[in-house]
Amino acid sequence: MRIAEWKEKVESQGCYDAVSEMLERIEKSRLNAYITVCKDEALKMAEKYDRGELKGRLAGIPVAVKDNISTKGILTTCASKMLSNYRPVFDAHVVEKLKQEGAIIIGKANMDEFAMGTTTETSYFGVVRNPHDEARVAGGSSGGSGAVIAADEAVLSLGSDTGGSIRCPASFCGVYGLKPTYGLVSRYGLIPYANSLEQIGPMADSIEDLALLLEVIAGKDTRDSTNAGREFRFEPEDRKLRVGIIAEMGGNDDVMKRFNEAVEVIREKHEVGEVSMPSFKYALAAYYIIAMSEASSNLARYDGVRYGFALEKLDSWRRYFSKVRAEGFGDEVKRRIMLGSYALSAGYYGKYYLKAQKVRTLVIRDFKKAFEEYDVLISPTMPALPFKIGELADPLTMYKADVNTVPVNLAGLPALSVPVGMVKGLPVGLQVIGNYFSENTLLNFGKWVGERFGEGD
């Protein structure tokens, strides 16, 4: 559902009744897209809107927030047993901005535990089902954020993207999802997985709605030292672009058939060529070494003492610390902590972590060279259609599914997933990658492409 459609509904029946209807839909849903539904708070805000007390660009609009983004007084669990009882005492920067613009936070969206996964199957609260086929996953790690848009269980949503975690569910659910340039959106209040890679971003049913949400959440925040201090304003533009197909990024036959059809549509207006990125064959391995290394450091703070999951005290601090973490973290999180600790250990730091950072430099160099020739680069967002639940039981197979998305995070570039129709009743996404702070170009190009495929409907 788009903002324009929601406003028509509110105008005809009032915000309270419209929100009540959405809450009823969520309650009956089998998707498991929410961890926490903010029923009472949402209805109070809807009443304020009906009384004319709610103002702003998002006034009266229901927004879902991924459950690794801090919301004051509302459970923020990271889909983990470790934080299953954690209620933050502050709002994330992006949540502050939502509230300033009158948005209604309708709930906290389900996700992979600590954002570690591609299918939302690692969530302590259970898998998110795909609205197009409930036997399949909605993608990850922001699976709930994608599913709620596709199922009309929210009008807008926020996700976070460390290696494709917005773009993957956007592709699998047939909606729009943007991973902004690193630093455009403040990460203050985002519970960290891998600080140098992740970014908060918007998901929506149309480019106009996506752009509006980005306008709201982008901008200066001194509490995030990596924040670029730049605002964003969407400005329509209509120009012929130089579009590069990345040779090293592809997919299976079903995905490539639809991708090639999209390329032919793009050729009708834009100049299309092919570009090779030699470093990409090393990008996936480098990404996981860096991400897991940062995760092992970030997650060291969960000790069962100050907040979150705790146990009865034991006679030994070391035993207590180990037992809390063994019971509080799921298998995938423990696997990544272990591998990250190994990569950072004294004997292997140079062999793994430093080498991965050198690959990262090569990836950035390849992108820089490509953007000297092309305005945007394209690929399939995901190399396959949405997986069946349980299909990716092997961790390595799950990691390989991120092959098209992780280079963007290594370079800190913006990337958009655009729905380009269905194959066998399942959505396919086109990934559009831009140069630093070229979100306006991406969104305009994405709008043009999306309109030719029915805007994802």
UniProtKB/Swiss-Prot annotation:
Signal peptide: none annotated. GO terms for molecular function: ATP binding; glutaminyl-tRNA synthase (glutamine-hydrolyzing) activity. It is an enzyme of class 6 (ligase). It comes from the Archaea. Keywords: ATP-binding, Ligase, Nucleotide-binding, Protein biosynthesis. PROSITE patterns: AMIDASES. Gene3D superfamilies: Amidase signature (AS) domain (3.90.1300.10). Belongs to the amidase family. GatA subfamily. Allows the formation of correctly charged Gln-tRNA(Gln) through the transamidation of misacylated Glu-tRNA(Gln) in organisms which lack glutaminyl-tRNA synthetase. The reaction takes place in the presence of glutamine and ATP through an activated gamma-phospho-Glu-tRNA(Gln). NCBIfam families: gatA (TIGR00132). This is Glutamyl-tRNA(Gln) amidotransferase subunit A.
